[in-house]
Amino acid sequence: VNVWAFRSRLGIVSSDLQQNYAAYIRTIEVVVSGFFASVGIWNHHQLSDDQVERSRAVLSEIGIGDLADRPFGQLSTGQQRRVLLARALVTEPANLVLDEPTSGLDLTATFRYLDTLRHLMSSGRTIVLVTHHIHELPPEIERVVLLKEGEVFADGPKASILNAQNLSTLFDAPVGLIQSNGWYQAVPG
């Protein structure tokens, strides 16, 4: 397997990546760095006008085009996560891996982020969403893999895997489950 070819088809968003960017770097530079799979822009990187234009377009597509020239460190956590999503999307990867993308976000920012994910999924993009919170699973998620102690505990269609029994066993606690309009919510069981 050619790792570089595989990497070009994969966009990644994680809180670890968010912490690696200097506060002074401009938002547009964070997004452009996605073309180089780097943290920041370095002297050996040769930026094209097309790359900068594409980066601005992706920021606009996800509703934060007005933040392009602001320092990354001046953005809210939710805005920073959306910038990282734009960075992941700038090369138009076939697949996205989102590792706890809404951790630390307030309710409004979480809902906004999930709405963006729903839009991406409806356009046919494959998304692997890593989360500890069932309420973050958009209705468009079809397959769920539950992990316990590093092992696959359950794997299959969301409707058959997400149930109170599986979740209670998974978390070693009584868990109830509420479903509404394709969304799930875990509650004390």
Predicted regions: what is each one?
Residues 15-74:
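ABC-family P-loop ATPase nucleotide-binding domains
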Residues 85-86:
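Hydrophobic anchor residue at the start of the ABC signature
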Residues 92:
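Conserved catalytic motifs of ABC-family nucleotide-binding domains
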Residues 96-100:
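Catalytic Walker B motif of ABC-type/P-loop ATPase nucleotide-binding domains
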Residues 131-132:
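H-loop/switch region of ABC-family ATPase nucleotide-binding domains
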Residues 144-157:
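H-loop (His-switch) and adjacent beta-strand-loop-beta switch element
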Residues 170-189:
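ABC ATPase nucleotide-binding domains
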